[in-house]
Amino acid sequence: MPSFLRGILKPKERHHENKNHSQMSSDSLTSSYPTSPPKLEKTEAGSIVSSTTQKKTSHHAKPTITTKTEQSQRRPKIIDQVRRVESLGEQVSQKQRHMLESLINKVYTGPLGEELVQTLYLRIWAMKETPESTKILQMREDIRDQYLRMKTERWLRTLIRGKKTKLRDFQKRYEEVHPYLMIERVEQIIMEEAWKLAAHIVQE
């Protein structure tokens, strides 16, 4: 119990005896705390907070704001666009577009598609093992075939797009994704087979 409360509760006859002791205790308590309390500031909501706490909060918030700004200014990589084919735009040339859609239909339904998935499977099986190749080889056959067809379609739509795709356009697109293909060997194999299928469209 603080000394100043003790003095109030004690009988009056002991008041004078404890007066000096109470004063000493009060002085020692006062000396153990800073003489000037932390500055208090009013917030917008009307509550009062310590200026020290406010400074700490603002200090920690700065790196987060900087990081978000850097992320918003980061330009999308070409490989992000390749993964999302719809962001690349479709083929505008009516003739090439018709030939492309016809080819993709054959990949899914005709003997061309059967030959394609067999070729891809054998090339992936013969290549140096990677996490992606292992995943594909362990798939059930029907799932694997569909997976390889979908990846082939993605590369076909990536390679044949724009006003009218020519050989120089393909060369430029290949150079853009070349660093990615050097890391992802499975994607390189699929892209090569897709190009073999689509070469006649570009050469027309």
UniProtKB/Swiss-Prot annotation:
Compositionally biased tracts (Basic and acidic residues): 10-20
Keyword Nucleotide-binding: no
Keyword GTP-binding: no
A Pfam family recorded for this sequence: Paramyxo_C
Compositionally biased tracts (Low complexity): 25-34
Keywords from the named record: Host-virus interaction, Inhibition of host innate immune response by virus, Inhibition of host interferon signaling pathway by virus, Inhibition of host STAT1 by virus, Inhibition of host STAT2 by virus, Interferon antiviral system evasion, Viral immunoevasion
GO biological process: symbiont-mediated suppression of host innate immune response; symbiont-mediated suppression of host JAK-STAT cascade via inhibition of STAT1 activity; symbiont-mediated suppression of host JAK-STAT cascade via inhibition of STAT2 activity; symbiont-mediated suppression of host type I interferon-mediated signaling pathway
InterPro entries membership: Paramyxo_C
Protein's name according to its UniProt entry: Protein C
Organism from which the protein derives: Human parainfluenza 1 virus (strain CI-5/73)
Gene that this sequence comes from: P/V/C
